[in-house]
């Protein structure tokens, strides 16, 4: 079966790829909002965008919306319009908070559009005082889904042969890599996907779903930090459905599994996809709540850990764990691998990768060490709250 992640043409890592759950659950073994404002260099002149693939057009200014005219004209209260508004506000809020935490560095911004409609905003901060590399991207994408992918995605009987299926997708995606090895990496992604009726089947019902998640990847375990992070995820989930947190926590543990290493990328959080079995308004509110929970879940941890002293050994361990991050993203992450195979916007696709990483031959931490404790937790997921 073909996942939608493998049929969507997306020019940005921020694109909301539809991801499947992990194929196998591994066996355990021992071992207040602020609006982001452009820096003075942006405010004085047009926003400059890097040249990328042919199907993208660099834009000098941020538009009010990336929606097509027909969508914009229909209603500003549509789910498409409100989701785009939500992710752009979330991008501004997160970027403002990250710049404040860094104390000096500012995001570089690229704005782009596509001839068929849609576009995106990529923001990256690197070599700051706190952040080695931080990327916060949003995108709105229109495209056409091949018939086989539509049948695979929605379970259309094999004797039906719908024509190409127009789709709409929007999302925010971010990966934040701090410099200090005691400060954890964070990833979050929230996305919305719609398909229109197949072109040869007018009147067929529109399909839609939500996906996303927020997960933490530390190099060293501070139990109070991990408990705080998971508590915020649970609070967001419990406002809507008490089964969400345990269900999405396990989904996260299973999805971010590095099969060739037999370990997970980090200490989890929440992850969900193909979510459409609840009221659409409820799920829009849920995705909004999750996005709004990113800063309160993460920034208090950064403030506590960003200035802790560390030594070369601890930095080297962080770089080894960053190597695991690279392995997962380049080998298993559907958004990244699809973008690389289809000629997407390379700078946006690889924004998730850390500025530096490390690989050592047959490295094994000493049993009982702090490094070993982290590895054990990545191999054997724990219930933190």
From Swiss-Prot:
Subcellular compartments: Plastid, Chloroplast
- Protein name (Swiss-Prot/TrEMBL): Oxygen-dependent coproporphyrinogen-III oxidase, chloroplastic
Annotated positions for site Important for dimerization = 260
Record: transit peptide: 1-67
Gene (UniProt): CPX
Concerning Pfam families, the annotation shows: Coprogen_oxidas (PF01218)
Q: In which tissues is it expressed?
A: Highly expressed in nodules and to a lesser extent in leaves. Not detected in roots.
**Assembly behavior:** Homodimer.
Citing just one GO molecular function, the answer is:
protein homodimerization activity
Q: For this entry, list what GO says about its biological process.
A: chlorophyll biosynthetic process; protoporphyrinogen IX biosynthetic process
Regulation acting on activity, per entry: Probably regulated by oxygen tension.
Under InterPro entries, the record lists: Coprogen_oxidase_aer, Coprogen_oxidase_aer_sf, Coprogen_oxidase_CS
What is the species of this protein?
Glycine max (Soybean)
Q: What EC class is this?
A: oxidoreductase
The yes or no answer to whether the keyword Transport is present is no
Active site located where?
187 (proton donor)
């Amino acid at each position: 079966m073909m996942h939608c992640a493998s049929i969507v043409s997306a020019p940005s890592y921020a694109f909301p790829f539809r991801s499947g759950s992990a194929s196998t659950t591994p066996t355990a073994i021992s071992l207040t909002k602020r609006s982001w404002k452009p820096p003075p260099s942006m405010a004085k002149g047009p926003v400059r965008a890097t040249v990328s693939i042919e199907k993208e057009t660099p834009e000098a200014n941020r538009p009010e919306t990336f929606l097509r005219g027909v969508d914009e004209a229909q209603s500003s209260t549509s789910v498409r319009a409100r989701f785009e508004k939500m992710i752009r506000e979330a991008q501004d809020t997160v970027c403002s908070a990250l710049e404040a935490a860094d104390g000096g560095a500012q995001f570089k911004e690229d704005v782009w559009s596509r001839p068929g409609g849609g576009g995106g905003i990529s923001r990256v901060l690197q070599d700051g005082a706190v952040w080695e590399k931080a990327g916060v991207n949003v995108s709105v994408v229109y495209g056409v889904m091949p018939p086989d992918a539509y049948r695979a995605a929605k379970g259309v009987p094999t004797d039906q042969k719908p024509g190409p299926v127009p789709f709409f997708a929007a999302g925010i995606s971010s990966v934040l890599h701090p410099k200090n090895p005691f400060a954890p990496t964070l990833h979050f992604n929230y996305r919305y996907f719609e398909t229109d009726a197949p072109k040869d089947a007018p009147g067929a019902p529109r399909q839609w779903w939500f996906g996303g998640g927020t997960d933490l990847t530390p190099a060293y375990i501070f139990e109070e930090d991990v408990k705080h992070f998971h508590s915020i995820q649970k609070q967001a989930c419990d406002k809507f459905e008490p089964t969400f947190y345990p269900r999405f926590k396990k989904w996260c543990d299973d999805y971010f599994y590095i099969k060739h290493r037999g370990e997970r990328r980090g200490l989890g959080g929440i992850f969900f996809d193909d979510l459409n079995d609840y009221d659409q308004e409820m799920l829009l509110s849920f995705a909004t709540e999750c996005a709004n929970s990113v800063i309160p879940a993460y920034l208090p941890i950064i403030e506590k850990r960003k200035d802790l002293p560390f030594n070369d050994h601890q930095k080297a361990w962080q770089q080894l764990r960053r190597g695991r991050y690279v392995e997962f993203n380049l080998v298993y992450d559907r958004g990244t691998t699809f973008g690389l195979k289809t000629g997407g916007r390379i700078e946006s696709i690889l924004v998730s990768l850390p500025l530096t990483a490390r690989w050592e031959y047959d490295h094994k931490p000493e049993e009982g060490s702090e490094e070993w404790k982290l590895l054990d937790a990545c191999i054997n997921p724990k219930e933190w709250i």
